Amino acid sequence: MYTPSYLKYSIISIISVLFLQGTHGDDGGWQGGHATFYGGEDASGTMGGACGYGNLYGQGYGTNTAALSTALFNNGLTCGACYEMKCNDDPRWCLGSTITVTATNFCPPNPGLSNDNGGWCNPPLQHFDLAEPAFLQIAQYRAGIVPVSFRRVPCMKKGGIRFTINGHSYFNLVLISNVGGAGDVHAVSIKGSKTQSWQAMSRNWGQNWQSNSYMNDQSLSFQVTTSDGRTLVSNDVAPSNWQFGQTYQGGQF
């Protein structure tokens, strides 16, 4: 079959562009930012935080955690997301290794300081305040602050999603943690065994989700949707005799 010469050149051009995009593209999703550290050598100062996870050791997050600047935190919706990160462009301090951290806290802006002199977390900077043990995996302590390349990666978690039920009757505050896949939860619905339909929960703060319905004395199911649009249903996670302050484990992405 005859193919016009101009069409041949067009096809070759398209193939060349696709090849280059496949080779380089957006550099695998890598973006540029900076990292500092906090929390002490045992990361005890990172416990709690704006995502609501509490004891990061007990919740399974360990010390590979980060507080995100305003530009990344998204008012708490990014809590639970995972980032692959490496120190770069500073051979004096960079160790050449790569780590994966989970977003567990917020690094607040400091408008009284300039962006390049202490106001590291000021908008629009993309900044990670790492737990000290995490920082020391990619850079030397004396560096203080280093340039990094980072990208979102799937979260690899052991066990199922955890639902910690706090609050009281007519105020169910559910902390959702240990979420795999995208990691950051953007929508949650709850259903009791005595109710007819799913009820959307509202995000109270961090990854604490709220329902004002009376859910006592019935088993509870949860529907969790992450930022990538995937939804997972965990049926009858909490038995009918569930108690406030207890944690129940569901399925996993």
From Swiss-Prot:
Ranges where the Expansin-like EG45 domain occurs: 48-160
Family matches, as Pfam families: DPBB_1, Expansin_C
Domain Expansin-like CBD residue range list: 170-250
Annotated signal peptide: 1-25
InterPro entries the record matches: Expan_Lol_pI, Expansin, Expansin/allergen_DPBB_dom, Expansin_CBD, Expansin_CBD_sf, RlpA-like_DPBB, RlpA-like_sf
Cystines in this chain: C51-C79, C82-C155, C87-C94
Gene3D superfamilies (UniProt xref): Expansin, cellulose-binding-like domain (2.60.40.760), RlpA-like domain (2.40.40.10)
GO cellular component, one term: extracellular region
Major location category of this protein: secreted
Membrane topology of this protein: Peripheral membrane protein
Keywords in alphabetical order: Cell wall, Cell wall biogenesis/degradation, Disulfide bond, Membrane, Secreted, Signal
Compartment annotation: Secreted, Cell wall; Membrane
Function of the molecule: Causes loosening and extension of plant cell walls by disrupting non-covalent bonding between cellulose microfibrils and matrix glucans. No enzymatic activity has been found.
Family indicated by similarity: Belongs to the expansin family. Expansin A subfamily.
The protein's name: Expansin-A8
Organism of derivation: Arabidopsis thaliana
Upper classification of the organism: Eukaryota, Viridiplantae, Streptophyta, Embryophyta, Tracheophyta
Gene: EXPA8
